[in-house]
């Protein structure tokens, strides 16, 4: 591996051992498949931000990552790097139907995000085959706007100013590379980014593949009963967007069967110690039912400290 980090053997102020970057990254080898419900936040509702001041983090506060594996390069890039355009083009092909008048997925937030990309250098130096969009808020910094706020109330995540927050969004993999290699490289890159930027809390929206939330009533009931975050991290849908579905009791379904039926990345995040916020949102534009995932990096270290890459 070409991405070893050399750090002193010490404890951070959150009790995380800083000499275990490999162990931290190792959990992401668990993901084997890419699904349509990858964790990303899609369109930012213009109606929700029309009269809202949007604050962003200075790019000077973030650290880059870059490493190689076989024919691939994994790194973070930012505007105006032309590779960001390649990332946007891949996102558009992954999320939307083809439109000859549009070739890339882009919005106002791209300028302020880090774009984690996987490049197949055997094709070219800018052939992006995987991408993630990351928005970071370091501890003790002014609150910034996140995409999840278009669907969920996440105010409680900001209560503790000692926590560094990161939203992960716009995850996608080229259709010809969906054999597990690229998603694992993306997640390893994500883990490295989390480590060097001292991220404490990761969150983002995850989707079920239909806006008919009743189709997933048992799954949503299971998540609500078994994987809700603690009160200090509790989040809930914006009320007018809240999905309406039958609430099942635990005695009315089989836990193991329901867990197996969850979308692959929701299962992967739960295995990594993630919580799922209360309720869900129906996104009729993208025909999905969305939930909010909240993940503590301390939980990741604790749960997977004995694994190696």
List where the protein language model places each region.
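Intrinsically disordered, low-structural-confidence terminal and linker regions
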Residues: 1-33
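Short amphipathic alpha-helix that is part of the acyltransferase structural core
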Residues: 60-129, 136
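Conserved hydrophobic/aromatic beta-strand scaffold that supports enzyme active sites
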Residues: 115-117, 131, 165, 292-294
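A short helix-loop-beta-strand connector motif used in the catalytic cores of GNAT acetyltransferases and
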Residues: 108-117, 142, 286-291
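Long, continuous compositionally biased terminal/linker segments
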Residues: 292-309
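Acyl-donor binding region in acyl/amide transferases
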Residues: 137-274, 280-281, 287-288
């Amino acid at each position: 591996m070409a991405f070893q980090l050399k750090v002193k053997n010490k404890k951070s102020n959150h009790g995380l051992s800083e000499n275990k970057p490999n162990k931290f990254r190792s959990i992401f080898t668990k993901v084997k498949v890419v699904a349509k419900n990858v964790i990303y936040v899609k369109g930012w509702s213009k109606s929700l931000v029309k009269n809202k001041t949007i604050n962003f983090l200075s790019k000077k506060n973030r650290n880059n990552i870059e490493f190689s594996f076989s024919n691939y390069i994994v790194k973070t890039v930012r505007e105006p790097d032309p590779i960001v355009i390649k990332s946007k083009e891949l996102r558009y092909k992954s999320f939307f139907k083809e439109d000859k008048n549009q070739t890339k997925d882009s919005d106002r937030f791209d300028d302020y995000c880090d774009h984690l990309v996987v490049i197949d250098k055997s094709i070219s130096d800018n052939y992006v085959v995987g991408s993630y969009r990351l928005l970071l808020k370091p501890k003790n910094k002014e609150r910034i706007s996140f995409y999840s706020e278009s669907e969920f109330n996440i105010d409680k995540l900001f209560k503790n100013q000692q926590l560094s927050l990161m939203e992960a969004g716009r995850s996608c993999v080229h259709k010809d590379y969906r054999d597990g290699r690229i998603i694992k490289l993306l997640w390893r890159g994500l883990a490295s980014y989390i480590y060097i930027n001292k991220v404490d809390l990761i969150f983002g929206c995850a989707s079920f593949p239909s806006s008919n939330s009743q189709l997933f009533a048992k799954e949503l009931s299971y998540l609500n009963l078994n994987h809700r975050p603690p009160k200090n991290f509790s989040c809930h849908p914006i009320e007018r967007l809240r999905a309406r579905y039958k609430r099942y009791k635990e005695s009315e379904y089989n836990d193991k069967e329901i867990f197996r039926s969850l979308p692959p990345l929701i299962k992967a995040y739960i295995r990594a110690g993630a919580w799922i916020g209360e309720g869900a949102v129906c996104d009729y534009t993208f025909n999905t039912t969305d939930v909010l995932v909240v993940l503590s990096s301390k939980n990741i270290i604790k749960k997977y400290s004995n694994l190696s890459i």
